[in-house]
Amino acid sequence: MDTIDLRDRIIGRAKDFGADDAGVCLASDLLEGPTHRKFPLPEGVENYHSILVVALKHPGDKPDLDYFIKRDGARFGNSEGNRRLMDISDRIGRWLTEEGITSRDLHYYVERGGVFLKGAAVLAGLGSIGVNNLLIHPGFGPRIRFRAHLVDAPLTPSVPLDFEPCMDCQRPCLNVCPEEALDHTGYLTGRCQVRLDRNAAEAVILPAEEDKPAARESHCCRKCELSCSYTGTFEIAGRQ
C-alpha cells in the first residue's frame, strides 16, 4: 500500500475509534530535536519509523475530562480524558496488529518513556504553539489533549500547518495567570508548577464507593487555556 494511503487509513481508523483529529510525524524528526536531547529516548524507539498523534477535544463545558483522580492505594492517577485517549491508542494497536503492523502506545509523561506531545502535534500538522505555550488546534483551539503511538511503518508524514493563531490577537491569556507565569517574554515553568501543586493540595476528597476506594480529585488550573479567544476558524485544505 502507498505510504500516503496507509497514513490516511490509520488516521481514519483513529477517528473511527473516537479521536477528534490525528496526524503522523517521523520519529526521527521529533526525537532528533533539541527538546529530546535533554531526556533519554523511549526504549526501543529506534525500531519504529513513525509516530501517530491522536487528539481529543476538551471543551470548557466538560471540565470533568481534565479532573485528575488518584484512588487510595493506587500508584498513579489519571483523568477521564487521558483514559479515553489510552483506549483509542489501545484500539489502534490491536487493529494494527491485525493488519500485520507492529506498534505500541507511548506513556503520557516524557520521563516515563513518552515524547513531547506538543512538539509531536506540531510536526503531525495538528496545530501551532501559541504565545501561551499551549498547542492551538485550528478547529478546537487550546482545549485539546494528545497521545502518541509508535508505528513500525514508513508512513508519509502529515504536513505541519502554516498557522499563526496569535498574530492579530489581544492575547488575554497573558494577563490571567494567578502566578504570572506568562508574559510577552515567554513561559515560566516554575511559576506554573506552583499553581499545579496548589491544585493538588486542594484536591476534592471523593468518598469510597462499593467497588472503589476513596480518591483525591484535583482540578488543575486552565485559566490561560480557557481565556484563549481563538475561534477555531482556520480551514485546512484536504483535511479528512
Language-model-detected regions and their locations in the chain:
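Non-catalytic, usually N-terminal nucleic-acid engagement modules in DNA/RNA processing proteins
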Residues: 1-77
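Catalytic cores of enzyme domains
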Residues: 33-34, 41, 70-240
